[in-house]
Amino acid sequence: MKRTFIMVLDSFGIGASADAKKFGDEGADTLGHIAEACARGEANVGRSGPLTLPNLSRLGLGKAAEESTGTFPVGLDKNADIIGAYGYASELSSGKDTPSGHWEIAGVPVLFDWGYFSDVENSFPQELLDKLVKRANLSGYLGNCHSSGTVILDQLGEEHMKTGKPIFYTSADSVFQIACHEETFGLDRLYELCEIAREELTDGGYNIGRVIARPFIGDKPGHFQRTGNRHDLAVEPPAPTMLKKLVDEKGGEVVSIGKIADIYAQVGITQKVKATGLDALFDATIEEMKKAGDNTIVFTNFVDFDSSYGHRRDVAGYAAALELFDRRLPELMALIKEDDILILTADHGCDPTWPGTDHTREHIPVLVYGPKVKPGSLGHRETFADIGQTVAAYFGLSPMDYGKNML
């Protein structure tokens, strides 16, 4: 019975890539800088002391990071008994965004340039805004700028509730984000507005990767909270991913947990499971692993590392989340059967010590575990697509155009 379980620790980079300077990210290191902050006692909110990741260390995380940066992460166990194959991968794709990273993991790197809204203020073309106002029958809009999602809620949330005007904002990523109050504006209306925005962006040739619905609740600044009803409207990958090939060539199952289905625009996904928060995502993953049959991929995105801690530059929160993930990892590993493969990886970096609020261009860890996986170094992988090629080979699928089998 062949089953693969892919866990993406969203934004968990392990050191700047060779081309990081081009992105303004030279020297970024999500894992390394979190570990250093913990060792200095600068991440003692909700946790304390050095970063402690014994289970990830046994899978080779520390050694993969050392291969990536030349420095072993402080606090991690240098003498851990290695039980998995480990390495680090560079990104071939042109961006450092979520779709690019995930598509490349699935064997389809993004070799074109996304469109971006690069102006920090008045970010969106007036023609686009006018069409959205007209088609969605809006009284106007707020924002129209670059912002962190939580900051803009405190700035404009109250005005949005009073006026009913949606909050439009973007970032350094190829995104058009719309924040609206679940109760005063309505979730269905927000989703409809996002569908209209997706159509207008596509028809207008803007080449924007995602429209993201950002629903929130609360009644005043400091009390606004984003809910778990986020919805991403992505464009489809430009070629068949290994997910789609498993479904088409083997009649296999691909179970999406968290935002995976949205990232791949639902293509190559046979089941969707919604869950919000690290523990809930873990619980859902464990349940689906227990049920998984032959020719199945269970694919989970642990978004909180990125959305709750990376972008918000919350070092202590990121460290605590990593330690929670590590504590729960044995539950997951206990479900691995004779022919199974477990892959732990990331899609980009988001160094919480780095200036700004955006992603960072970094290597990702590639940790592979299973009874038939030989422990040891996989070295430097030149593309995330090595993961997709490895999975394709494991299931006996037609080869991907990019990547090399690691096993």
Swiss-Prot record:
Binding site for Mn(2+) 1: D10, D347, H348
Keyword Ribonucleoprotein: no
UniProt GO BP: 2-deoxyribose 1-phosphate catabolic process; 5-phosphoribose 1-diphosphate biosynthetic process; metabolic compound salvage; nucleotide metabolic process
Keyword terms: Cytoplasm, Isomerase, Manganese, Metal-binding
Pfam families xrefs: Metalloenzyme (PF01676)
Pathway noted in the entry: Carbohydrate degradation; 2-deoxy-D-ribose 1-phosphate degradation; D-glyceraldehyde 3-phosphate and acetaldehyde from 2-deoxy-alpha-D-ribose 1-phosphate: step 1/2
Cofactors (names): Mn(2+)
Signal peptide region: none
Reaction catalyzed: 2-deoxy-alpha-D-ribose 1-phosphate = 2-deoxy-D-ribose 5-phosphate; alpha-D-ribose 1-phosphate = D-ribose 5-phosphate
EC number: 5.4.2.7
Entry note: cofactor: Binds 2 manganese ions.
Domain of life (superkingdom): Bacteria
Enzyme class: isomerase
Sample GO molecular function, one term: magnesium ion binding
Protein localization: Cytoplasm
Record function comment: Isomerase that catalyzes the conversion of deoxy-ribose 1-phosphate (dRib-1-P) and ribose 1-phosphate (Rib-1-P) to deoxy-ribose 5-phosphate (dRib-5-P) and ribose 5-phosphate (Rib-5-P), respectively.
UniProt xrefs under PANTHER family: PHOSPHOPENTOMUTASE
Family listed: Belongs to the phosphopentomutase family.
Listed name of the protein: Phosphopentomutase
